[in-house]
Amino acid sequence: MTEFKVVHTICPYCGTGCGIDLVVKDGKVVDSHPFKRHPVNEGKVCIKGNYCYEFVHSEDRLTKPLIKKNGEFIEATWDEALDLIAGKLKQYSPDEVAFFSCARGTNEESYALQKFARTVLKTNNVDHCARIUHAPTVVGLGECFGSGAMTNSITDLAQADVLLIYGSNTFEAHPLIARSIVKAKENGTKIIAIDPRTTHTAKMADLHLKLIPGSNIDLINTITNIIIQEGMADEEFIKNRTEGYDELKDVVSKYTLEKTAELSGIPAETILEAARMYGSAENASIMYCLGVTEYTFGVDNVKSCCNLAMVTGNLGRPGTGVNPLRGQNNVQGACDMGALPNVFPGYQKVGEAYERLENLWETADLNREIGLTSPEVLHKAGEQVKFLHIVGEDPMVADADINHVEKALKSLDFFVVQDIFLTETAKLADVVLPAACWAEKDGTFTNSERRVQRIRKAVDAPGDALPDWLIVRKLAEKMGAGEKLNFESASEIFDEMAKVIPQYAGMSFERLGIDGLQWPCKTPEDPGTPILHKEKFLRPNGLGKFTPVEHKDADELIDEEYPLILTTGRIIFHYNSGTMTRRCDSITNEIDENFIEINTEDAKELGIKPGEKVRVSSRRGTVNADARVTENVIKGVVYMSFHFLEEATNKLTNSAYDPVSKTAELKICAVKVEKI
């Protein structure tokens, strides 16, 4: 007899956190539908969410542990694989091992992995892919406001009088958040877009500031200066709720309209109009994404946004705030869980909170030194770092300068990958562990607006695959430390998380229900916090901190040999390394190969016609792509996505990183384009 059931869960792709219902027939997921009354997506879904189930039962799912022998993978039992890993781990010191957690996995899994690293192996060398996207957000917002997360809720963006959309192609990267832009437009909201490309999002704007990549700080400082000079600053807010304003005024006063217009390529009158539009609004909201963070000055870019919002008093109310759109489904949660080298769960600093964590975890001698970030691990691989365990990340496609990544991974003494497919990264591993995907386990995700939501198991994992948290628990048992991770379920882990993480203290699986809760939620009666910083900031003194920032050049500038700026981003059909979306036939039928957007004038000068194959080269590598000749990119700039491993864009990109966040400069490098 045929059996059907419908399981409510959360989409596994971007940080929007859309509610979906999985349709299960005879133990297989056969369809998905948007959840009609979900508070985020309200019964709508994008193409990725609509077909998210299609990869679940792919024939190439990992089903058994694999051990590499003589260059070939051999199927193994869990005991064989975990005994081998545990034996290797016992050979290394805390400084010689490192772990990359997974922003695709659940909160419970990131919590378990970082706890294993810290309590069993005494290392803080724990990181995840926020490092290559929104680590500058965590640092910048944290320093200025006291919390490195979206200040407002997705739905209240539509209440803004002005939306400043900065470095975000929301309609393709976060399509259901883009519905708030549509609603805002219908409500009469004025929209300012800052982007070197004429994206679908920019086409909605009343003003489009087509900046030359690298002129970011100059532009925002100039807008801030105009607002101050023309008397649009909120003096009462500044006086009562901030500190450091005089220093900010001194710095931004040097950024003139004329100089910035020349540097940015934006007409002076357009910059002036944008400043007046934002500065005069009663409620103005800044939305930004990786076009702000993925620079060697990404932290300073974020701080400049904070300065602008505080100068105008646009915080603590609906339709205001500084709102980073987080990339992956649980990148916010992985940060919250302490899958970072400098903080324990709940952003408790490793050098300050160790006694509290030692008491809660019933352990001794937690490492008090800040660990290595993922770029630092790769730079020190084979030297200081001997052992690396990666859970659910594919840096061989997703990271900058993947030739450098490959060299680093091959130099390790021992390398473990835990994933649902044999990815490009997993192919280099000594041991590969088969994991359950999101539809095959229980747990929670935390979306971009700090909403903690339950995911629910719909089907069994294939073969011997296990949830990531259970794999980590079994490894702890092999290390003789099973009591450190003595969990029987995801809900048990969540209960411990609520004791450890102040922002989650009032939450439980039962309280999350269907709608979830937005942190901070500190007591069982607390309804959660849709808007941060209403009466005071989360810094110790309750004040927002102005942090003046100055222009910095990109690490790599154009020259005669490499005369074009390459910038990268997402397209609506695929996600990140394409590991999941490119196994969804309904999506790959739309597009399944890489392309490059090039300005009409640049194409004419190079003799390139639409649809022709071109060779794109940087100082690090070369790839081929189909040319899309268009006015959607400004002259001197080309654009590529990074979803296609066959002609991987990240062979070209630059691994130079922000000195504070260690985030690579994926948004700007120098290239040349040649007709093949």
From Swiss-Prot:
Binds 1 [4Fe-4S] cluster. Residues 4-60 form the 4Fe-4S Mo/W bis-MGD-type domain. GO terms for molecular function: 4 iron, 4 sulfur cluster binding; formate dehydrogenase (coenzyme F420) activity; formate dehydrogenase (NAD+) activity; metal ion binding; molybdopterin cofactor binding; NADH dehydrogenase activity. [4Fe-4S] cluster binds at C11, C14, C18, C46. Disruption phenotype: Deletion of the gene does not affect growth on formate and H(2) production is only slightly reduced. The fdhA1-fdhA2 double mutant is unable to utilize formate for either growth or H(2) production. It comes from Methanococcus maripaludis (strain DSM 14266 / JCM 13030 / NBRC 101832 / S2 / LL). GO terms for biological process: formate metabolic process; respiratory electron transport chain. Induction: Expression is induced by formate limitation. This is F420-dependent formate dehydrogenase 2 subunit alpha. The genome of M.maripaludis harbors two sets of genes encoding the F420-dependent formate dehydrogenase (Fdh), fdhA1-fdhB1 (Fdh1 isozyme) and fdhA2-fdhB2 (Fdh2 isozyme). The Fdh1 isozyme is the primary Fdh and the Fdh2 isozyme may not play a major role. It catalyses: oxidized coenzyme F420-(gamma-L-Glu)(n) + formate + 2 H(+) = reduced coenzyme F420-(gamma-L-Glu)(n) + CO2. Belongs to the prokaryotic molybdopterin-containing oxidoreductase family. The keyword Metal-binding applies. GO terms for cellular component: membrane. Its cofactor is [4Fe-4S] cluster; Mo-bis(molybdopterin guanine dinucleotide); Zn(2+). Catalyzes the oxidation of formate to carbon dioxide, with coenzyme F420 as the electron acceptor. In vitro can also use methyl viologen as electron acceptor. The keyword Endoplasmic reticulum does not apply. Dimer of an alpha (FdhA2) and a beta (FdhB2) subunit.
